UniProtKB/Swiss-Prot annotation:
Residues 12-26, 227-236, 372-385 have a biased composition (Basic and acidic residues). This is Leucine-rich repeat-containing protein 27. Pfam families: LRR_8 (PF13855). The keyword Cell wall biogenesis/degradation does not apply. The lineage of its organism: Eukaryota, Metazoa, Chordata, Craniata, Vertebrata. LRR repeats lie at residues 55-76, 77-98, 101-122, 124-145, 147-168. SMART domains: LRR_TYP. Residues 1-26, 206-236, 372-394, 503-523 are annotated as: Disordered. The gene is Lrrc27.
């Protein structure tokens, strides 16, 4: 039976590279699809052990039912490891040392309660996902992972760091863990050696949280008291873990603090941090308002030497700027009112100009319409005047038969003011009456026909042209009707001649001739 232990596989791979390559391919295929017996219920000792040879930088072991992670051998190429939705309860201590190039670790939906402290030595880890794990404390070594850019702690019952720190984000969590790491490296019963503190930037003090001071202030004479030394140790900024095995302990207080200026600077920075924290949490007071008595006594001597007199400052009058609302000045009100008035005037002027233009357009349109109507009316009157016969002829044509046409202006007048009838006119006028209507009617028809032929329709006003054509048609119909009636009358006159229209002299004596009753002036 072939030996499949890790040592045998490694020796075989060293002797036969081709066989090692086949083994790597088989192992990679095996890791991509693990059998279901890894997730058997009741087998609490089931783990995942063995050598994994894979050229791929990604390994997905999610939803495999894994309960324990055995000894992972070195996989230098692995960068992403997915272990979500398993039954893992713990991570091996040397897990992160065996995966030096790991950048992504997904441990969501497991049962992990503690992370190994070896995570602090990792140099490439960027993303750590711990969602839905019953983890309560993060290791302080996690603060040393400077490459970490994403940390998922959703639905984790964390007690350390506090919830306030977790809510502030990754930077606050790492800073808090670094501070706790420094406190763990320098316990309270030991004295801090003389070490020059590194320079701190504003980013390093972004979200620090400091422990509460202990009750009871130390006495000024007991400089080497353990509580006092621990209080002084709290003032140190976060720093990397230092190798202090070769340094000796010192009982002098001057060795604990590098200089008085640094003490003041550190205390000032901490006071600023505390003030920022007190804005959000008013009920908790993290630091005392004043310096401890021993530090105050050490700084008073130097302050007295370098103290300078304050320059005389003129006392300013009480300002009501914060009490009263910001009211605009009178000048600003005037400028604003003038500006609004100018804007209003400009708008009114523009509106008036528009109204003037519109009114002028309406006037021009009305004048043009009136001119067109007047021109059309004059043209109609001119046409009607051409069609109408003279006034005297019209009156003669409308006089009924048996009516004597007498020119009253030319008739002689008797001395008594009465008109004398002329005998010659009454004898010749019936012949003229019978001939003049037909001639006048023929003249009318000729003039109307000639006018229709000479008229030219320009097409500029179609409605007017149609109206004129209808009038011409009506006039033509009237003339035709008059001609028909005149012909009928002439026919009747030929069949029944009257003595008054013959023009012949009557055989009866003058006394028996019929007289015109309209011109009989005798009584």
């Amino acid at each position: 039976m072939e030996d499949t232990s890790p040592q045998a596989v490694a020796e075989k791979a060293a002797k036969d590279p081709k066989a090692a390559k086949d083994l790597k391919d088989d192992a990679a295929a095996a890791t991509k699809s693990f059998p279901d017996h890894f997730s058997r219920e009741g087998d609490d000792q089931m783990d995942f052990e063995g050598v994994i040879f894979s050229s791929s930088p990604v390994l997905d072991l999610s939803q495999r039912g894994l309960r324990h992670l055995g000894k992972f051998f070195k996989i230098p190429n692995l960068q992403q490891l997915h272990l979500q939705r398993n039954l893992l309860r713990e991570i091996p201590e040397d897990f992160f040392q065996l995966l030096p190039n790991l950048t992504w670790l997904d441990l969501r939906y497991n049962k992990i309660k503690v992370l190994p402290s070896g995570i602090g030595s990792h140099k490439h880890l960027k993303t750590l996902l711990l969602e839905r794990n019953p983890i309560k404390m993060l290791p302080v070594e996690l603060g040393q992972v400077t490459t970490l850019t994403a940390l998922n702690l959703r639905h984790c019952p964390l007690e350390f760091p506090p919830r306030l720190i977790v809510q502030k984000g990754l930077v606050a969590i790492l800073t808090f863990l670094r501070i706790c790491s420094v406190e763990k490296a320098f316990p309270g019963d030991e004295l801090l050696p003389e070490v020059s503190a590194p320079k701190m930037g504003s980013n390093d003090l972004q979200y620090p949280v400091l422990p509460l001071p202990r009750k009871g202030s130390p006495s000024e004479n007991s400089l080497n008291d353990p509580d006092q030394e621990k209080e002084k140790a709290d003032f140190f900024p976060p720093m990397e873990r230092l190798d202090l095995s070769e340094l000796r302990k010192s009982n002098a207080a001057s060795e604990i603090w590098p200089s008085k200026e640094e003490i003041r600077r550190f205390w000032k920075l901490r006071q600023e941090i505390v003030e920022n924290e007190q804005v959000e949490i008013q009920e908790k007071k993290l630091l005392a308002v004043e310096l401890p008595p021993n530090l105050k006594a050490a700084l008073n001597v130097k302050e007295k030497k370098h103290r300078k007199p304050w320059p005389a400052v003129r006392k300013r009058s009480t300002s009501f700027k914060g009490i009263l609302p910001n009211l605009p000045s009178g000048y600003q009100n005037t400028v604003h009112a003038n500006r609004m008035e100018d804007t209003h005037k400009a708008a009114l002027q523009e509106l008036q100009e528009k109204e003037t233009v519109l009114e002028q357009r309406r006037r021009d349109k009305r004048a043009l319409q009136e001119w067109r109507e007047q021109t059309q009316h004059m043209r109609t009157r001119r046409e009607l005047s051409k069609l109408q016969p003279p006034h005297s002829n019209m009156m003669a044509s409308k006089i009924p038969f048996a009516t004597d046409l007498t020119d009253y202006e030319k008739m002689p007048v008797s001395p008594f003011g009465k008109v004398k009838p002329s005998g010659e006119g009454t004898a010749q006028r019936p012949i003229e009456i019978s001939a003049s209507p037909l001639a006048e009617l023929e003249d009318k028809i000729k003039r109307h026909t000639q006018q229709i032929r000479t008229r030219s329709f320009l097409g500029t006003n179609p409605m007017q042209d149609i109206k004129t054509a209808n009038q011409d048609l009506e006039t033509t119909k009237k003339l035709q009707e008059e001609l028909r009636k005149l012909k009928v009358e002439m026919t009747l006159n030929k069949d029944h001649p009257f003595p008054s229209f013959t023009g012949n002299l009557s055989l009866h004596p003058p006394a028996s001739q019929p007289q015109n009753i309209f011109f009989n002036t005798k009584s």
